[in-house]
């Protein structure tokens, strides 16, 4: 099988990822589990050539110099793929993450109603967090799409690499990729403030300068979407503040308290019937109570504020998991595996 056939097989089987690893058969991740494809093992040359053939010259140069590279590419009529090519102890390796060609709506994702409201906020910072593979990009794409369909404005995305490709609808959308279009997230963000955006998506807030510029953009009247790999709202606030030197922490807490609109922390859970996965969310909104807790460095008290904020659209992850179990969507065992307090999910 060539790479196109392998990727077509992967998409047909609803795999989120295709793994190629020298010395082993190709494998796919379906509903969270990695399974072998019933074909022969691939040697180093086969994996190397499959990946090398779909790279452009600049990607090959990065791969040869650094021994790894991130990029995205599209097979017309099939899907887009985010690729990480690397080297390992048996030879070449690569992972292809499937990015559906069609962007799902918030309704199709069965996202909480508050997500649509957050997508249309005039300013402030909305963070979607969670581990790798938790569906952050899918959620953000749906929120950007909702904004694009409902508001006349300028949406600017900065990604590494570009994943979901948006068409300009009511809004003008410009998508920039780190590498081909800009040297770094921080460079692109610095320029963004001079590019008349209403909304800026920062694919990954991975360093101090990017976080500082994203906060500044939110403070100066822009809607900023960003992602972090944190697992809860409280850890997200701590992560942002902890990046800064001690002398700046108090000022940063004040900036975060003023600009933070919401933190959505999500985790993917296997459906009880085994046919797929569903996202469970912790949702923290920037209420006056939450803003005060951030400003006063009382992050530990956030959880109880989220717990009691259901009427405002807030929920803890465990509250959402309880609801999913009650509705027979996921099993108690799956909820227990994802919960903050597993003891609340016996059985």
Per-segment meaning from a language model:
Residues 1-347:
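Short, flexible helix-loop junctions that flank or precede catalytic/ligand sites
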């Amino acid at each position: 099988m060539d790479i196109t056939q392998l990727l077509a097989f992967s998409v047909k089987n609803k795999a989120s990822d295709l793994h190629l690893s020298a010395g082993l058969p190709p494998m796919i991740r379906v509903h969270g589990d990695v399974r072998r494809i019933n074909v022969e093992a691939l040697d180093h040359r086969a994996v190397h050539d499959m990946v090398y053939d779909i790279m452009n010259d600049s990607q090959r140069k990065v791969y040869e110099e650094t021994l790894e590279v991130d990029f995205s590419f599209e097979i017309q009529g099939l899907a887009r793929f985010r690729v990480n090519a690397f080297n390992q102890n048996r030879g070449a390796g690569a992972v292809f993450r499937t990015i559906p060609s069609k962007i799902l709506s918030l309704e199709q994702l069965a996202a909480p109603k508050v997500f649509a409201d957050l997508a249309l906020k005039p300013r402030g910072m909305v963070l979607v967090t969670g581990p790798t593979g938790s569906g952050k990009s899918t959620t953000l794409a749906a929120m950007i799409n909702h904004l694009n369909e409902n508001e006349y404005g300028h949406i600017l995305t900065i990604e590494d690499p570009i994943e979901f490709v948006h068409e300009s609808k009511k809004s003008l959308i410009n998508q920039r990729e780190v590498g081909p279009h800009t040297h770094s997230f921080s460079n692109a963000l610095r320029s963004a403030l001079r590019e008349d955006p209403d909304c800026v998506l920062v694919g990954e807030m991975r360093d101090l300068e990017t976080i500082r510029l994203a906060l500044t953009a939110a403070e100066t009247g822009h809607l900023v979407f960003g992602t972090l790999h944190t697992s809860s709202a409280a850890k997200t606030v701590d992560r942002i503040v902890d990046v800064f030197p001690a002398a700046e922490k108090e000022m940063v807490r004040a900036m975060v308290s003023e600009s933070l609109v919401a933190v959505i922390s999500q985790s993917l859970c296997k459906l009880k019937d085994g046919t797929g996965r569903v996202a469970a969310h912790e949702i923290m909104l920037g209420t006056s109570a939450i803003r005060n807790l951030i400003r006063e460095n009382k992050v530990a008290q956030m959880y109880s504020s989220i717990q009691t904020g259901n009427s405002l659209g807030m929920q803890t992850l465990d509250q959402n998991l309880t609801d999913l179990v009650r509705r027979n969507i996921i099993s108690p065992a799956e909820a227990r595996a994802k919960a903050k307090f597993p003891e609340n999910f016996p059985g």
